[in-house]
Amino acid sequence: MKVTQEKLPDSQIGLEIEISAEASKKAYETKVNTLARTANIPGFRKGKVPRQILLQRIGTEYIKATTLQELIEDSLKAAIKQESLESIGDFELKSKFDELVQQFKPGEPLTFSAAIDVPPTVTLGDYQSLSVKAEETVYNPEKLENWFKERQEQQATLVPVEDRKAEMGDVAIVDYEGYFAPEEGEETERKPIPGVQGQDFRVDLTEGRFIQGMVEGIVGMQPEETQEITVTFPSDYPREDLAGQVAIFKITVKELKAKELPELDDDFAEEVSEFATIAELRESLEKQFTEEAQEATKKSIHDAMITQLLEICPVDLPNTLIEDEVTQVLTQTAMQMEQMGIDIRQLFVKENIPKLRENARPDAISRLKQSLILQEIAKVESITPEASLVEERINKIKEQLSERDVDFDKLEQMVTEELTMEAILNWLQEKATVELVPEGTLKPAEDQEAESQEE
């Protein structure tokens, strides 16, 4: 078989394949003989239909088309094997099929063009001399104090208040009714907002809770007092019919309670943790928050290195892999949303899928390139994770998933890949020049990209 190759963009190989006269005749005759044995033609027994009648009734164009379809597929498989090519996904017929059918004459050679996706190629740049800026996250003792404050709030005892007005930090139990605010000068009766009514509703009087102005309006009220508070729903409010709307809330304070915070002592430590003393709890949290800060710094360094690797290491990606990765991105997104309690049925409907796939494509391409670049570096530098680390990570995951059905072969593969990526990034970090800057100094990559596009 005569095959001519041509390298195409997007990790494709173009193939021009010439089907020999002998092969075209053999394929056509095989198809006619098969139809002669299997076709149901009125007035004839199966297998006894004269050739000319068969051609007239079924049609030579149909026979040529079905013959050609099989012939193209078989020829492509043979060409890929002959040329020792590694193909992924389905082939793409470059020639127009209708024209090929018209050109096809059994017993004469026929040439067609197709393209196949092949494994991606990675061109490594100077990955051993990376120079990056990254943000340094420093442990802030304030985080520890905030942690204790939050736990004190959660463990607080609510004490009824009757002799004073509501203050920030209190808890109010209220009945409320929401109304659309009438337009200026409008005297019509105001309309209730559907679904915006409630009884015995708990309102924690802290800044930033609920709609802006609501908490501030309740502060200063007393039990059994009723007031009307005017607020504006934020523009990004989940209910589109209320976003940006001005509303009037009729609020009745039924109960007012003050929070009595527990002492930060050993009893408190035992209540909120597995530690017996407040000193042990404080020491453990300091260690945890310090390690988290170090990990955040490390992540910033690794993210910066990956960004630079994407710039200096071109990757030619086949569409087959991109489409598979897009599916993976959407699957993971759906699983995360379900874990958050979000109903995905309205989002993942048939008419939304093309747009969702389009939106997921940039992320899929970036993920693929990152993975392929790091895999190529690992291959070149012979970087593999230590077997003991793989076993340790697997055992830790097994403990967490003890009562679930787990494919342990797949788990081992996933953990090995994950630790390989970590090992490569740590190796690259040792060789890179890293400038650490204060947290919050660097702009996110998407902001920088937007600015460059504006320029």
Curated annotation (Swiss-Prot):
<keyword id="KW-0131">Cell cycle</keyword>
<dbReference type="InterPro" id="IPR036611">
    <property type="entry name" value="Trigger_fac_ribosome-bd_sf"/>
</dbReference>
<dbReference type="GO" id="GO:0051083">
    <property type="term" value="P:'de novo' cotranslational protein folding"/>
</dbReference>
<dbReference type="InterPro" id="IPR027304">
    <property type="entry name" value="Trigger_fact/SurA_dom_sf"/>
</dbReference>
<dbReference type="GO" id="GO:0051301">
    <property type="term" value="P:cell division"/>
</dbReference>
<dbReference type="GO" id="GO:0043022">
    <property type="term" value="F:ribosome binding"/>
</dbReference>
<dbReference type="InterPro" id="IPR001179">
    <property type="entry name" value="PPIase_FKBP_dom"/>
</dbReference>
<dbReference type="Pfam" id="PF05697">
    <property type="entry name" value="Trigger_N"/>
</dbReference>
<dbReference type="GO" id="GO:0005737">
    <property type="term" value="C:cytoplasm"/>
</dbReference>
<dbReference type="GO" id="GO:0043335">
    <property type="term" value="P:protein unfolding"/>
</dbReference>
<dbReference type="GO" id="GO:0044183">
    <property type="term" value="F:protein folding chaperone"/>
</dbReference>
<comment type="function">
    <text>Involved in protein export. Acts as a chaperone by maintaining the newly synthesized protein in an open conformation. Functions as a peptidyl-prolyl cis-trans isomerase.</text>
</comment>
<keyword id="KW-0697">Rotamase</keyword>
<dbReference type="Pfam" id="PF05698">
    <property type="entry name" value="Trigger_C"/>
</dbReference>
<dbReference type="InterPro" id="IPR008881">
    <property type="entry name" value="Trigger_fac_ribosome-bd_bac"/>
</dbReference>
<dbReference type="InterPro" id="IPR037041">
    <property type="entry name" value="Trigger_fac_C_sf"/>
</dbReference>
<dbReference type="InterPro" id="IPR046357">
    <property type="entry name" value="PPIase_dom_sf"/>
</dbReference>
<dbReference type="GO" id="GO:0015031">
    <property type="term" value="P:protein transport"/>
</dbReference>
<dbReference type="InterPro" id="IPR005215">
    <property type="entry name" value="Trig_fac"/>
</dbReference>
<dbReference type="Pfam" id="PF00254">
    <property type="entry name" value="FKBP_C"/>
</dbReference>
<feature type="domain" description="PPIase FKBP-type">
    <location>
        <begin position="169"/>
        <end position="262"/>
    </location>
</feature>
<protein>
    <recommendedName>
        <fullName>Trigger factor</fullName>
        <ecNumber>5.2.1.8</ecNumber>
    </recommendedName>
</protein>
<dbReference type="GO" id="GO:0061077">
    <property type="term" value="P:chaperone-mediated protein folding"/>
</dbReference>
<dbReference type="InterPro" id="IPR008880">
    <property type="entry name" value="Trigger_fac_C"/>
</dbReference>
<keyword id="KW-0413">Isomerase</keyword>
<dbReference type="GO" id="GO:0003755">
    <property type="term" value="F:peptidyl-prolyl cis-trans isomerase activity"/>
</dbReference>
<comment type="similarity">
    <text>Belongs to the FKBP-type PPIase family. Tig subfamily.</text>
</comment>
<keyword id="KW-0143">Chaperone</keyword>
<keyword id="KW-0132">Cell division</keyword>
<keyword id="KW-0963">Cytoplasm</keyword>
